[in-house]
Design a protein with these regions (language model features):
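A flexible loop/linker signature enriched in serine peptidases of the S9 family
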Residues: 114-121, 142-146, 165-174, 189-194, ...
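Hydrophobic beta-strand positions that form the internal "hydrophobic ladder"
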Residues: 109, 158-161, 206-207, 266, ...
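Non-catalytic accessory segments flanking enzyme active sites
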Residues: 60-153, 164, 253-283, 288-307, ...
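C-terminal motif of bacterial Sec signal peptides marking the signal peptidase cleavage site
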Residues: 13-15
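A conserved hydrophobic secondary-structure block that centers on an alpha-helix together
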Residues: 134-197, 203
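Cap/lid segment of the alpha/beta-hydrolase catalytic domain
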Residues: 139-155, 165-170, 184, 419-425, ...
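Beta-propeller blade signature
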Residues: 125-126, 176-180, 224-234, 280-284, ...
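Active-site-proximal cap/loop segments of hydrolase catalytic domains
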Residues: 506-708
Length: 708
C-alpha cells in the first residue's frame, strides 16, 4: 500500500481589464539549432528527423543546447516585471501545514506532513500515548531536496518497513529496509528497481520488480523485460530469486506482485501495455505448487483485492467495462467460476478492502460516490460527503474499527474525516489553516457536445459574481488518456487565480477513465482525434458562453496531456493565446523506442504497426505537423533533464521545430529543469519557481502589464 502526500502543482491567473496586445513586438532571436540529414523510412515514406542528435542526452552538444535555451528562456522571463511578485504570492499561500490521511502499522499511527514550504513531505508517527516523532524525512536525503520518497511498505505486523527513493526525479529507485521500531537499516541498499510495488512475505522478505540495466543511457534507453524478484532479508541482492518474467515466452513490460494478508498466496500481474493484464496465483505455503493462471487475456484488467480463507476477491472489468467485484475459490479461480459480489453498474467502480468491509468508490460524472458493503456484497450504507468532489483514503486493517478519508474539490482545500466502520458516524479530524473561504467560490459542472455529438462533462471553477464578458483569463487543463480520470482537487494557485477573477476549467475527455473502458477506448489508437476534438470543443464552449475569449485563453497539460496541448495548438492555433505543454509525448513516430514508451501502444499504436497506423500518427504527431507561415500561440514548453518516463528529447525537438517555423512575434520558449524528472517528487521550491515562470509568461502574453 502506498501512502503519499504530493502537494498539488500551483497555477496562478490574474484578471485584467485592458485590451490585450502583443507583449513581444520584436521578432525573437532564438539560439541556433543545428539540423542534420537524418531520414527514416516508414512503409515507403521518408520522414526527415533533422534534430535527431538532440536525443543523445549524454552528448556535450546537447548539454550546450540545453544551456543556451535555458539562458534565453530565463532571460526572457526575468524581464517580466511581476514575475517575482507572483513567486512571492505563491510562497506565501503555499506556506500552510498539509497532512495526509493517517494509517496504522504495528503500534504506531503514521501520516505524512509538510510544514508548509518543505521540499518533500515528511513521514511522521505517533505512539499509543500520542507522542509524535519523525520517521522518515526525505529532506535529509539530499542537500537540494531532489531525492524523494516513493513506495513505503510495512510488513503485516508493522515491525519492518521497506521504502524506495528516487534521485533527481528518475523512475529508477533504490530500496532500503528498516527495523520500524529502532529505525536501524537492515541489510544492503537494493538498486535498479523500477515501476515496482513492494509485497512482504511475512517478516522474511519481499517481492519487488525491475528491469535489466539498459544498454546505453539509463535516462533514454528502452526497457522491455520486467521481472519479479524475491529478496530475502539478510542476503545480498545478487542472490535474489527470480520469480516471474525475463524469458522469451514472457515478454511483459509491467510485472508486479501482491501477497494476501495471511501470507498464503502470491498474485502476479503481468502486462504488455498500460491497459490489460494477466493474473497468476502462487501458493506460498507449498514451494512445489505450480503457478496457476487466473486470467490469460490482456483484454481486461483484473486485480486481487482480498481473501477470506480460500475465497478470493477480485476487481475486474472483464465482461464489465465499468468494473465489478467478484469472488472465487482458490481451487477454481478462473473467470468461468467467478460469482458477482458487487455487480457492474452504470458508474465506474474501484474497490478497497477496509477493515472487514469493502468500500466501493464510484465515479458519477467524474465525482466521488462512496458505498460501504459487507463481504457478502450487501450494502451497509452510502457515505455522506461534504459536497461534490473527490474522496480518497479509506484504509484500515482487519483489526481496526475506524477509517480515515480525505475530501477535496477545486474550491475546497483537502480535509480529513474519521469514520466509525460499524455505525458510519463521521467527524472532521483535521482542517487546514489556510486563509481561503470555499463559500466564496463555485464549481459548476457543465456538459457540452463534442464534434461528433458526444456529451462531455467539464468542471468550471471561479469566484462567485464573475462577469461573463469574455475577458476572464482562463486556464483550460486536460489529459485524455491511459484510463486516467481527472477528479476535482484543490490547489493553492487555483485559489489565487480565482481570487483575482480567473477561471479554471477541466473537461473529462475521452481516453480517460471517467466512464469506464469504453470511454477510454474511444480515445485510443485511431480514435485519438476524439480527444483533441473534445478539448477543442471545451475551448469553444468557454468562448461561446463568454467565460473567456481566444485572447485570454491558455491551455495546459502534462505527459499525455502535453501531447494534447501540442496537437490542439497546431490544429487550432487561433483559439488559444498561450500553450503550456509539459513533459509531453510529442514525437509520435519514435516514442516507443525510448525507455518504457513501448508500453503505451494500447493508447497510441506505433508507427511500426501498419501503414494505416503510421499515417494516422503522422497526421497528428506534434513534431511532424508544425507548418511554416502560421502564427502559433505563445508557447512555454517545460521538461526535466532527468525525465526517463517521457524523455526530454520530445520537448527538445518540438521546441527546435517551432522556433524554426514560427511566424509572427509570439514567443516559443523551452524551460528545462535540471536534476528533475517527470514530475513526481519534484521539490516544492522547484515547483514554485516553475509555476511563477509559467504564470508570468501566461499573463505577459495575454497583455497584462501589471497585477491588480
Amino acid at each position: 500500500m502506498i501512502h503519499k502526500l504530493f502537494p498539488a502543482a500551483l497555477l496562478l491567473l490574474v484578471a485584467c481589464n485592458q485590451t490585450p496586445n502583443n507583449a513581444n513586438s520584436e521578432k525573437m532571436n532564438y539560439p541556433q539549432t543545428r539540423m542534420d540529414n537524418t531520414v527514416d523510412t516508414y512503409f515507403g515514406t521518408q520522414i526527415a528527423d533533422p534534430y535527431r542528435w538532440l536525443e543523445d542526452d549524454r552528448s556535450a552538444e546537447t548539454a550546450e543546447w540545453v544551456k543556451q535555451q535555458n539562458n534565453f528562456t530565463f532571460g526572457y522571463l526575468s524581464k517580466i516585471p511581476y514575475r517575482q511578485a507572483i513567486k512571492e504570492k505563491l510562497e506565501k499561500l503555499w506556506n500552510y501545514e498539509k497532512i495526509g490521511a493517517p494509517f496504522t502499522e504495528g503500534d504506531y499511527t503514521y501520516y505524512y506532513k509538510n510544514n508548509g514550504l518543505q521540499n518533500q513531505s515528511v513521514l511522521y508517527r505517533k505512539d499509543k500515548d500520542g507522542k509524535e516523532e519523525v520517521f522518515l524525512d526525505p529532506n535529509t536525503f539530499s542537500k537540494d531536496g531532489t531525492t524523494s520518497l516513493g513506495e513505503v511498505a510495512f510488513s503485516e505486523d508493522g515491525s519492518l518497513v521497506a521504502y524506495l527513493i528516487s534521485e533527481g526525479g528518475s523512475d529508477w529507485r533504490k530500496g532500503i529496509v528498516l527495523n520500524a521500531k529502532t529505525k536501524e537499516v537492515i541489510g544492503d541498499t537494493l538498486i535498479d528497481i523500477k515501476f515496482s510495488s513492494i509485497a512482504w512475505k511475512g517478516n522474511e522478505g519481499f517481492f519487488y520488480s525491475s528491469y535489466d540495466k539498459p544498454k546505453g543511457s539509463e535516462l533514454s534507453a528502452k526497457t522491455d523485460q520486467h521481472k519479479l524478484y524475491y529478496h530475502k532479508l539478510g542476503t545480498p541482492q545478487k542472490n535474489d530469486q527470480l520469480i516471474f518474467g525475463g524469458t522469451p515466452a514472457e515478454k511483459y513490460r509491467y510485472v508486479s506482485g501482491a501477497v494476501s494478508l495471511d501470507a498464503h498466496y502470491l498474485f502476479i500481474s503481468a502486462a504488455v501495455n498500460t491497459s490489460g493484464n494477466k493474473l497468476f496465483l502462487k501458493d506460498l505455503k507449498n514451494p512445489k505448487a505450480p503457478l496457476v493462471t487466473i486470467t490469460n487475456s490482456l483484454d481486461a484488467d483484473t486485480q486481487f483485492i482480498d481473501n477470506d480463507g480460500t475465497t478470493l476477491f477480485f476487481e475486474t472489468n472483464l465482461n464489465a467495462p465499468n468494473g465489478r467485484l467478484v469472488k472465487a475459490e482458490v481451487a477454481k479461480p478462473q473467470p468461468e467460476y467467478w460469482q458477482d459480489v458487487i455487480p457492474e453498474t452504470k458508474n465506474v467502480l474501484s474497490i478497497s478492502a477496509t477493515g472487514n468491509y469493502f468500500f466501493a468508490r464510484y465515479m458519477v460524472d467524474a465525482l466521488s460516490q462512496i458505498k460501504q458493503y459487507n463481504y457478502k456484497g450487501e450494502l451497509v450504507r452510502e457515505v455522506k460527503l461534504p459536497s461534490i468532489g473527490t474522496a480518497g483514503g479509506f484504509y484500515a486493517k482487519k483489526s481496526e474499527n475506524h477509517t480515515y478519508f480525505t475530501f477535496t474539490n477545486y474550491a475546497y482545500p483537502a480535509q480529513i474525516y474519521k469514520m466509525d466502520l460499524a455505525t458510519g458516524a463521521t467527524e472532521l479530524y483535521w482542517k487546514p489553516a489556510i486563509a481561503f473561504d470555499a463559500n466564496n467560490y463555485e464549481s459548476k459542472q457543465v456538459f457540452y457536445n463534442s464534434k461528433d455529438g458526444t456529451k462531455v462533462p467539464m468542471m468550471i471553477t471561479y469566484k462567485k459574481g464573475i462577469k461573463l464578458n469574455g475577458k476572464n483569463p482562463t486556464l483550460l487543463y486536460g489529459y485524455g488518456g491511459f484510463n486516467v480520470s481527472l477528479m476535482p482537487t484543490f490547489s493553492v494557485a487555483n485559489a489565487v487565480w480565482m481570487e483575482l477573477g480567473g477561471v479554471y476549467a477541466v473537461p473529462n475527455l475521452r481516453g480517460g477513465g471517467e466512464y469506464g473502458k469504453q470511454w477510454h477506448d474511444a480515445g485510443t489508437e485511431m480514435q485519438k482525434q476524439n480527444v483533441f476534438d473534445d478539448f477543442i470543443a471545451a475551448a469553444k464552449y468557454l468562448i461561446n458562453q463568454k467565460y473567456t475569449s481566444p485572447e485570454y485563453l491558455a491551455i495546459k497539460g502534462g505527459s499525455n496531456g502535453g501531447l494534447l496541448i501540442g496537437a490542439t495548438m497546431l490544429q487550432r492555433p487561433e483559439l488559444f493565446k498561450v500553450a503550456l505543454p509539459a513533459v509531453g509525448v510529442l514525437d509520435m513516430l519514435r516514442y516507443h523506442t525510448f525507455t518504457a514508451g513501448a508500453g503505451w501502444a494500447y493508447d497510441y499504436g506505433t508507427a511500426d504497426d501498419s501503414k494505416e497506423m503510421f499515417e494516422y500518427l503522422k497526421g497528428y504527431s506534434p513534431l511532424h505537423n508544425v507548418k511554416k507561415g502560421v502564427s502559433y500561440p505563445a508557447t512555454l514548453i517545460t521538461t526535466g533533464d532527468h525525465d526517463d518516463r517521457v524523455v526530454p528529447a520530445h520537448s527538445f525537438k518540438f521546441a527546435a521545430e517551432l522556433q524554426a517555423k514560427q511566424t509572427g512575434n509570439n514567443p516559443i520558449l523551452i524551460r528545462i529543469e535540471t536534476n528533475a524528472g517527470h514530475g513526481a517528487g519534484t521539490p516544492v521550491s522547484k515547483t514554485i519557481e516553475q509555476n511563477a515562470d509559467l504564470q508570468a509568461f501566461t499573463l505577459w502574453n495575454m497583455g497584462v502589464k501589471k497585477l491588480n
